[in-house]
Amino acid sequence: MTNTKHEFSSESEFLAAYDASQFDRPSVTSDVLIFSVSNSVAENWRKADKQLFSVLLVHRDDYPQKGKWNLPGGFIGIDETALDAAYRILRNETGATGNIYLEQLYTFDAPNRDPRTRVFSIAHMALINKNKLHYSGKHDAKWFSIEYNNGKLLLHNEDLTLTEADLAFDHAMIIKTGIERLRNKIEYTDIVFDMMPSEFTLGELQQVYEIILGRKMIPAAFRRTIANKVVPTDKMRSGSGHRPSVLFKKHC
């Protein structure tokens, strides 16, 4: 006995007869990796404040994986693009408006990455100046400074230190993928300035490069890297224990 293939006379006839239930329908989420930088007050008054490279995490109050921390995210609506969903999540979680740097990072699709069902995550990376944020406090979200060396990730804030095991799903992998992407782009693009205040010293900027790259930079090499990216202002910053420094801004 042979199966006879039905011949349709039009696209609309085919679509009307199409049975989507014949195939599995995995869910798709958008998870947004939000990076920023901030100051940590120096313990030694002779030293400049330390720059921190940070990520925003949300505490999970419900199952699955209750008690862990995850990146801001959610399911993509049926009428949304992945990018639209990422912007929606970014606005809802941070209150950020205006021109925010956001790029698609990677699609995470391990079959067992979510215990509920088959879920793909289209992850995006956002770079934000914290001064532009107007966080509403409706979720238990906190900034954690990033320590990433030799493939090992630790996250710190004033109350907690998180290991990879404290992060929900595969979000440790998403964070590490984002760090590697940023490391690969920081020296030949100007995306670092999306996390910086409008004015900064060269010392502050060098610290940001170093904490993202995970290595020290020779001052002369650093200045070559940023030579065409910044311009001096006519302002100075004074601080206890060190000489006033010229403030720079991004070269437009």
Predicted regions and their residues:
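Entry/capping segment at the start of metal-dependent catalytic domains
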Residues: 2-17
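N-terminal strand-loop-strand
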Residues: 13, 17, 21-70
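Short proline/glycine-enriched turn/loop segments at secondary-structure junctions
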Residues: 20-22, 112, 235-240
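Active-site segment of metal-dependent pyrophosphate-handling enzymes
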Residues: 50-54, 83-87, 91-152, 159, ...
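Conserved Nudix-box catalytic region and its N-terminal flanking loop in Nudix hydrolases
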Residues: 48-97, 184-207, 211
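A conserved mid-domain beta-alpha-beta active-site/ligand-binding segment of alpha/beta enzyme cores
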Residues: 173, 177-178, 182-183, 187
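Long, intrinsically disordered, low-complexity Ser/Thr/Pro-rich regulatory/activation regions
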Residues: 230-252
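Charge-enriched amphipathic alpha-helical scaffolds
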Residues: 215-234
